[in-house]
């Protein structure tokens, strides 16, 4: 895992967009973002049990696996959105970027590769893309039935109950 400030320059979303300014993992924690490097399935199982994740599935994001809809899907994952549930991803193979909004509404880019697990709190604005290799295989963990419902950023999501709870939580974490 490597985290840094997104450079905001034009260009393919799958490029690194590295500003050269690193972000300390402690800052990610202040945003409510949790990171683990996991080397075995048993560690994933332990984390799932501890956090009450009951279901899981796997997704492969690649042109070979998704065919003609790959570019459309990658663009949809990159729309800024939030979820009303935690988003938990364990990278099984390949790599990709999660971008999360900072307290100042800037993007923090988090590069994840095989063995990295990230937990995004419900209500955080974020987006995802593969890196330039165009290949990410990930396990998705869920507390209940598997679902992935993005709520794209807008006035309505700014007032969303889960967004408001996240902002209160973030203020408490930063204190």
From Swiss-Prot:
Residues annotated as binding Fe(2+): 81, 83, 87, 126
CC terms in the record's Gene Ontology section: cytoplasm; nucleus
Subcellular location: Cytoplasm; Nucleus
Free-text cofactor note: Binds either 1 Fe or Ni cation per monomer. Iron-binding promotes an acireductone dioxygenase reaction producing 2-keto-4-methylthiobutyrate, while nickel-binding promotes an acireductone dioxygenase reaction producing 3-(methylsulfanyl)propanoate.
GO biological processes: L-methionine salvage from methylthioadenosine; methionine metabolic process
EC number assigned by the record: 1.13.11.54, 1.13.11.53
Involved pathway(s): Amino-acid biosynthesis; L-methionine biosynthesis via salvage pathway; L-methionine from S-methyl-5-thio-alpha-D-ribose 1-phosphate: step 5/6
Catalysis: reaction(s): 1,2-dihydroxy-5-(methylsulfanyl)pent-1-en-3-one + O2 = 4-methylsulfanyl-2-oxobutanoate + formate + 2 H(+); 1,2-dihydroxy-5-(methylsulfanyl)pent-1-en-3-one + O2 = 3-(methylsulfanyl)propanoate + CO + formate + 2 H(+)
Keywords on record: Amino-acid biosynthesis, Cytoplasm, Dioxygenase, Iron, Metal-binding, Methionine biosynthesis, Nickel, Nucleus, Oxidoreductase
UniProt-recorded Gene Ontology molecular function terms: acireductone dioxygenase (Ni2+-requiring) activity; acireductone dioxygenase [iron(II)-requiring] activity; iron ion binding; nickel cation binding
Keyword Nucleus included in the entry's annotation: yes
Lineage: superkingdom: Eukaryota
Cofactor(s) listed: Fe(2+); Ni(2+)
Signal peptide feature range: none
Entry keyword annotation includes Amino-acid biosynthesis: yes
InterPro entries xrefs: ARD, ARD_euk, RmlC-like_jellyroll, RmlC_Cupin_sf
UniProt-annotated binding residues for Ni(2+): 81, 83, 87, 126
Similarity-based family: Belongs to the acireductone dioxygenase (ARD) family.
Entry function: Catalyzes 2 different reactions between oxygen and the acireductone 1,2-dihydroxy-3-keto-5-methylthiopentene (DHK-MTPene) depending upon the metal bound in the active site. Fe-containing acireductone dioxygenase (Fe-ARD) produces formate and 2-keto-4-methylthiobutyrate (KMTB), the alpha-ketoacid precursor of methionine in the methionine recycle pathway. Ni-containing acireductone dioxygenase (Ni-ARD) produces methylthiopropionate, carbon monoxide and formate, and does not lie on the methionine recycle pathway.
Name of protein: Acireductone dioxygenase
Species whose genome carries this gene: Phaeosphaeria nodorum (strain SN15 / ATCC MYA-4574 / FGSC 10173) (Glume blotch fungus)
Gene name per UniProt: ADI1
């Amino acid at each position: 895992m490597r985290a840094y400030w997104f450079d905001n320059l034009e260009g393919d979303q799958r490029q690194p967009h590295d500003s050269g300014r690193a972000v300390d993992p402690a800052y990610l924690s202040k945003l409510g973002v949790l990171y683990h490097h996991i080397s075995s399935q048993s560690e994933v199982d332990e984390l799932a049990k501890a956090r009450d994740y009951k279901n899981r599935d796997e997704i492969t994001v690649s042109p070979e696996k998704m065919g003609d809809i790959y570019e459309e899907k990658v663009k949809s994952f990159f729309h800024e959105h939030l979820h009303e549930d935690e988003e938990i991803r364990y990278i099984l193979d390949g790599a990709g970027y999660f971008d999360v909004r900072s307290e100042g509404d800037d993007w923090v880019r988090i590069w994840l590769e095989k063995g990295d697990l990230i937990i995004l709190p419900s209500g955080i604005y974020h987006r995802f893309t593969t890196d330039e290799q165009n290949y990410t295989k990930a396990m998705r963990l869920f507390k209940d039935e598997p679902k992935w419902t993005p709520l794209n950023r807008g006035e309505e999501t700014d007032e969303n109950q889960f967004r408001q709870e996240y902002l209160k939580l973030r203020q408490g974490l930063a204190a």
